[in-house]
Amino acid sequence: MNRLPNSASALACTAHALNLIEKRTLTHEEMKALNREVHDYFEQHVNPGFLEYRKSVTAGGDYGAVEWQAGGLNTLVDTQGQEFLDCLGGFGIFNVGHRNPVVVSAVENQLAKQPLHSQELLDPLRAMLAKTLAALTPGKLKYSFFCNSGTESVEAAIKLAKAYQSPRGKFTFVAASGAFHGKSLGALSATAKAAFRKPFMPLLPGFRHVPFGNIDALRELLGECKKTGDDVAAVILEPIQGEGGVILPPSGYLPAVRKLCDEYGALLIFDEVQTGMGRTGKMFACEHENVQPDILCLAKALGGGVMPIGATVATEEVFSVLFDNPFLHTTTFGGNPLACAAALATIHVLLEENLPAQAEQKGDMLLDGFRQLAREYPHLVQEARGRGMLMAIEFVDNETGYRFASEMFRQRVLVAGTLNNAKTIRIEPPLTLTIEQCEQVLTAARRALETLSTAQSTTAVATES
């Protein structure tokens, strides 16, 4: 039997990869070879731009550090055996830590039975996860659509709002400046960063943006849309803007948005892809002011850092537009048994260990420390802000933020900038971070700022002379 063209090359690649997957440790020579190999394959087959983006995690100036395995709940180990304290959290996916044993065990047990669903028989874990989210989420949220990512959950929310509001003659969506809701076409239409939007114009029609946190601007736009017949179908917001730079709205803003939506018959969509699952000190950030959305978007930490999963949770009134034709919006892998097992275990850990409360306590400790550093280094730091374990340090310019991330990396602490605000470095560790590790982060931040300050002073003296 003839093999397929190019099969020998592909087989060699898969055999090599499977051999690596089986290995627990690497020799020094194997590490060096793997680092070079991964660098080359990123450059030649993934995207060379990622190598530049990951400059802050570069060893020796010629290749990016290559991830190998989790260390403990809150650490990562690279191929050279160096252990890093994770304060980036995979952009917010590791709320219950790396390889949390409860989550891993649930996924392994389900894997031993059936990894994916048949699409014909009823899958029990999807039913149980939907019931769990109905019990856990605020207000009248009752039905869940499951997908694989935050962007997909936002896409589902937009389509759900469209299906509900189109018969009512409402087609306009309102999002906020600085917003990040994803990069697929619908989600990107709500996202507010020109660099992400411009190459794909025109996006979906009917999306408007108002300043985040400005209730008067929202009121004015809703009124204007009403007068011109462009009635608003939905307002979509992050309760705290993550990629925008960890921007908190003024107190009372979210309740006022809820009131305006009710007044104008608009749905309220909360994108809690990054703020949900205990990250801010409550299970969901909207609970800080007891605001209940019509649609809630979840993902990232929902899978416990083990499986990708997203969810779009809605009230029965809104979700009922899918009852007559449940195939109106579906996805092959959404709600698969492995992902649902991970999500159920993640929620169990969050509740059993009261991790949202821990996030509030340890977040307060870290934020107090960062604010003290901001006062000590005002020539470098503009502001430290956040809520719970979602924090940011905003520097005076992009270069200073980049150099801070590089210095933290040298001290084996992982941090990175936000997508919409390059001079803002996010601090988004697992909620399982210990008090001792919190102190380690603050010590590393102080040393990094001391290094930057000394370098700045040296440069200034050299310039004067």
Curated annotation (Swiss-Prot):
Protein name: Putrescine aminotransferase
EC class name: transferase
Organism: Cronobacter sakazakii (strain ATCC BAA-894) (Enterobacter sakazakii)
GO biological process entries: L-lysine catabolic process; putrescine catabolic process
Reaction(s) the record says it catalyses: an alkane-alpha,omega-diamine + 2-oxoglutarate = an omega-aminoaldehyde + L-glutamate; putrescine + 2-oxoglutarate = 1-pyrroline + L-glutamate + H2O; cadaverine + 2-oxoglutarate = 5-aminopentanal + L-glutamate
The enzyme's E.C. designation: 2.6.1.82, 2.6.1.29
Keywords, sorted A to Z: Aminotransferase, Pyridoxal phosphate, Transferase
Gene, per the UniProt record: patA
Similarity comment: family membership: Belongs to the class-III pyridoxal-phosphate-dependent aminotransferase family. Putrescine aminotransferase subfamily.
An example Gene Ontology molecular-function term: putrescine--2-oxoglutarate transaminase activity
Chain positions with N6-(pyridoxal phosphate)lysine modification: 300
InterPro entries membership: Aminotrans_3, Aminotrans_3_PPA_site, Class-III_PLP-dep_AT, Putrescine_aminotransferase, PyrdxlP-dep_Trfase, PyrdxlP-dep_Trfase_major, PyrdxlP-dep_Trfase_small
Binding-site residues, pyridoxal 5'-phosphate: 150-151, 274, 332
Pathway: Amine and polyamine degradation; putrescine degradation; 4-aminobutanal from putrescine (transaminase route): step 1/1
